[in-house]
């Protein structure tokens, strides 16, 4: 079983490209196998097509983006705004975790601007937690594996929580060298340009990603483009406080010293 395996579990088609594709590409360059799993079909992402047509369109776009990232693709398991934290869906997510057998799981922030993101996060965390619990049955059935898993949470959309408080990254990944490839993968989601213009006032989803990437880079104090991450508590996931992203990415990974000081005060 290859320990160099990373799994991104996000809500909608294009969420991975917005928040995590740069980190995945850097891992891929370092010989990691990367896995791409959106839980939702994206069926709500259009004011021009009906739900089934939108879902089919977005499935093709996501598959194209995953190929661009050289990632293994897993199909969605629910529709937009219909995701709930149920044991049935947890069994589905846990099956993908066991199939991918990741050392690193990337997912949404625990608190984000919409429920789909937060429920995806909860399912991803519980599925990762269950990776070494053979008595928890997955759907389809997959064997448990016994290796450390570390979960990292992306920064929330807009870099703040739903009550508008800024959210600080624990660590920054330098995505400058892969930013154009990340942008190209996001551009594969062509159907989203009009939808995001109308629904969320994004002048361009590509420009919005560029701006967020540069802002996170600015916050890093070091990188032009960056993605920010916070590491989940290791209890139940690994034997000790490990940081495999740091170990894998070296100089492209910068820990925010002020965040680390805050952890020392609270633990």
Language model features with spans:
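Active-site rim/loop-helix segments in enzyme catalytic domains that contact anionic ligands
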Residues: 1-100, 130, 239-248, 261-264
């Amino acid at each position: 079983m290859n320990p160099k395996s990373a799994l991104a579990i996000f809500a909608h088609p294009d969420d991975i490209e917005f928040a995590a594709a740069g980190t995945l590409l850097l891992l891929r360059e370092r010989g990691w196998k990367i896995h791409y799993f959106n839980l939702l079909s994206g069926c709500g992402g259009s004011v021009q097509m009906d739900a089934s047509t939108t879902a089919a369109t977005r499935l093709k776009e996501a598959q194209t983006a995953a190929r661009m990232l050289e990632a293994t693709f897993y199909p969605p398991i629910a529709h937009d705004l219909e995701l709930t934290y149920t044991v049935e869906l947890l069994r589905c997510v846990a099956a993908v975790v066991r199939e991918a057998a990741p050392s690193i799981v990337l997912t949404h922030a625990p608190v984000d601007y919409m429920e789909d993101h937060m429920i995806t996060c909860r399912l991803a965390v519980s599925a990762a937690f269950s990776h070494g619990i053979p008595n928890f049955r997955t759907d389809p059935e997959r064997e448990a594996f016994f290796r450390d898993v570390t979960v990292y949470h992306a920064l929330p959309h807009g870099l703040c929580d739903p009550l508008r408080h800024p959210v600080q990254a624990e660590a920054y990944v330098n995505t400058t060298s892969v930013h154009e490839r990340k942008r190209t993968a996001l551009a594969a989601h062509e159907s989203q340009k009009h939808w995001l213009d109308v629904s969320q006032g994004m002048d361009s989803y590509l420009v919005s990603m560029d701006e967020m990437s540069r802002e996170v880079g600015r916050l890093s104090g070091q990188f032009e483009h960056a993605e920010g991450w916070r590491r989940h508590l290791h209890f139940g996931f690994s034997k000790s406080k490990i940081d495999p992203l740091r170990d894998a990415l070296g100089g492209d990974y910068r820990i925010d010293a002020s965040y680390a000081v805050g952890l020392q005060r609270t633990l």
